[in-house]
């Protein structure tokens, strides 16, 4: 592949996307869920110009959509330094049918630590959002962030 053809990818939160990009995602979802809906009808329904839809439709996609092919990603968990914390996290990972590729737990400072997990979700259909929510629901986990993903 020529270096001029390479396009960089970014993970970006939905709430900071321009309205036209968010509408494009909604239109793509509507078209996927209703094969009888035409592009003309869909852009009217979501009040977006066809030119804006065509501009963004091949450049924006939900993280989970790309994860279907390559289901490897890395998360960082911010946790309280509690005995058995890592075991609780790994138990949840196991219940979600995820495979651990790499794991690193930082040295605790001020009773806080981080756990970095590289995971494979090839044996499950659960979405990345559901995985993050499940890990956030563990007692003493204060934050979970997606920091990388294979594409």
Swiss-Prot record:
SUPFAM superfamilies: ACT-like
Domain ACT residue range list: 74-149
Matches recorded under NCBIfam families: PRK04435.1
Entries under InterPro entries matching the protein: ACT-like_dom_sf (IPR045865), ACT_dom (IPR002912), UPF0735_ACT_dom-cont (IPR008310)
Family: Belongs to the UPF0735 family.
Full protein name: UPF0735 ACT domain-containing protein SH1278
HAMAP family: UPF0735 (MF_00707)
Residues annotated as transmembrane: none
């Amino acid at each position: 592949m020529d270096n001029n053809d390479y396009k960089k990818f970014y993970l970006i939160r939905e709430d900071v996307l321009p309205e036209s990009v968010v509408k494009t995602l909604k239109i793509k979802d509507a078209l996927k869920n209703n094969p009888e809906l035409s592009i003309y009808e869909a852009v009217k329904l979501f009040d977006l110009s066809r030119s804006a839809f065509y501009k963004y439709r091949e450049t924006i996609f939900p993280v989970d959509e790309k994860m279907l092919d390559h289901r490897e990603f890395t998360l960082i968990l911010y946790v309280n330094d509690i005995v058995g914390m890592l075991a609780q996290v790994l138990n949840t990972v196991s219940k979600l049918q995820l495979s651990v590729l790499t794991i690193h737990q930082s040295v605790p400072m001020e009773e806080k630590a981080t756990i970095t997990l590289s995971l494979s979700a090839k044996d499950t259909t659960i979405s990345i959002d559901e995985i993050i929510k499940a890990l956030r629901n563990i007692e003493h986990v204060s934050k979970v962030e997606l920091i990388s993903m294979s594409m």
